[in-house]
């Protein structure tokens, strides 16, 4: 099946949107409804193994993190939404068992979503995110991306003096990729980066606080 990215808007400022582990091009909640389509053109893409690209072969890596390294002159700004760092993500034995079992076990996926949103959201919401991830990703890709974002480390290749403006956004109830984690990783690799903590939300602000997320993204992207 041909890949059909979701395009929102027709503005002059183009934005490539890459989803997370449980997402897809069409798994951004209601965020697209609150974006400024007159100023921006957003292209929501499926990663290999997700959405329309579930049958795509090749490697499943967090190579998208290396866009600034590969083509710095083509990136005007970078926004990370609850992003994993360029380093590996340390886990204890229990944590690894939970995450590595998520490819085959829907219950593990639900537990991860519940944990990373502060154990405060409804079962209906959690079940919907789990269902979307099951329907829009292949088991092989889901497992392979975990191994990449949890164990790959290319932080030594990053240049602290990079001039590209960087914004990092996290939710206050996400205990896994918290503000403290960003301060120890992203803000070290990109010393000029900005960090915003969104209130009343965790790891999925596109569902939990979409208006605040859209506002934060576009305030940063829209600056001269």
Show where each model-derived region lies.
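Alpha/beta-hydrolase fold catalytic core
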Residues: 1-16, 33-41, 136, 151-154, ...
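Serine-hydrolase catalytic-loop signature spanning alpha/beta hydrolases and amidase-signature enzymes
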Residues: 20-30, 42
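Conserved loop-alpha-helix segment in the C-terminal half of the alpha/beta-hydrolase fold
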Residues: 165-201, 207
């Amino acid at each position: 099946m041909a890949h059909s990215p979701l395009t929102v808007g027709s503005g002059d400022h183009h934005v490539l949107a890459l989803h997370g582990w449980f997402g897809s091009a069409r798994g951004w909640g209601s965020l697209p409804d609150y974006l400024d389509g007159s100023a921006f053109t957003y292209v929501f893409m499926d990663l290999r193994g997700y959405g329309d690209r579930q049958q795509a072969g090749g490697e499943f890596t967090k190579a998208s993190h290396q866009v600034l390294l590969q083509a710095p002159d083509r990136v005007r700004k970078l926004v990370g939404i609850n992003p994993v760092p360029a380093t590996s993500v340390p886990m204890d034995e229990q944590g690894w068992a939970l995450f590595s079992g998520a490819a085959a076990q829907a219950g593990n996926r639900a537990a991860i979503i519940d944990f990373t949103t502060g154990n405060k959201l409804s079962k209906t919401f959690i079940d919907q995110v789990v269902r979307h991830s099951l329907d829009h990703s292949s088991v092989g890709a889901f497992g392979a991306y975990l191994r990449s974002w949890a164990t790959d480390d290319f932080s030594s290749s990053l240049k602290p003096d990079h001039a590209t403006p960087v914004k990092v956004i996290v939710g206050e109830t996400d205990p896994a990729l918290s503000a403290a984690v960003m301060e120890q990783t992203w803000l070290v690799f990109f010393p000029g980066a900005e960090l915003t903590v969104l209130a009343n939300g965790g790891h999925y602000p596109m569902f939990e606080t979409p208006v605040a997320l859209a506002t934060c993204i576009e305030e940063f992207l829209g600056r001269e």
